[in-house]
Amino acid sequence: WVYKKLGVGDIMYRDYDSHVIQEGGFFQAEYNRNKLAAFVSGSLSNTTYWRYGRFYYDKDHARSKTVNYMGFTVKGGANYNINEYHNVFVNVGVISRAPKFAYGAFMTSTTSNVTNPNAKNEKIYSAEAGYGFKSAWLTANLNVYYTLWRDKAMTKTGTLTNKETGKETDYYMNMTGVGARHMGVELELKSEPLTWLSLNGMLSIGNWEWDNNATGYAYNDAGQPLTSNGGIASGVMADDHAW
């Protein structure tokens, strides 16, 4: 199709179907008595991915391998009303969820059936604690939080330049195992000093950082591994595969 005049309805570069099947179950239990309210919840899920590519594959090889990821969530929290004005609360949670279809489970989902052998469930561990105040004219909520992200999949794009010819090749880099740490303090205020006047204020102070050195490998738009000069590498994750 590179040297052919195309018309309405012609297909070029990509022609594929993404298939995603998800099954799961959920439960939640609650307790509410006197000044204390609490809950615990959880879920279990299975995510199935496969791809059917018609542009770069013949009929016998059009369907990719099927990959499955089991995930779950566990959450719990409690709130205690000290009196009619003051309350304190705490929440914790753990989440394990399937990587994304594109640039997660599949290396180049738009053009290739190649799956990512290093794709893992993304894990999130989070906790928060806070204090609340409520009166006739002022409502305030203060909370602190701490969240860890593990095995996150991310994509980076850029350009590789051949030092001898100057030719530039666009690449994408599929990174897995990315970790991050988020922590901070949040304050929310709402005041109604007059019946016709409402004032709202918010303050958020956070420290969000990447906390590991993740490795990714460079590929072109066709899903081929690239060298640091933009050429085709000898294999996926081979010695000459750019990372």
Which residues does each PLM region occupy?
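Signature of Gram-negative outer-membrane beta-barrel scaffolds
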Residues: 1-83, 103, 108, 215
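Transmembrane beta-strands of outer-membrane beta-barrel proteins
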Residues: 1-2, 39-43, 91-93, 141-145, ...
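Hydrophobic, lipid-facing positions within transmembrane beta-strands of outer-membrane proteins
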Residues: 21-27, 42-44, 72-76, 88, ...
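Residues on the lipid-exposed face of transmembrane beta-strands in outer-membrane beta-barrel proteins
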Residues: 25-31, 76-80, 129-135, 144, ...
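Gram-negative outer-membrane beta-barrel transporters
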Residues: 32-35, 146-148, 169-243
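Repeated loop/turn-to-beta-strand initiation elements of outer-membrane beta-barrel proteins
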Residues: 35-38, 85-88, 137-140, 195-199
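Surface-exposed extracellular loop regions of Gram-negative outer-membrane beta-barrel proteins
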Residues: 46-57, 66, 80-128, 139, ...
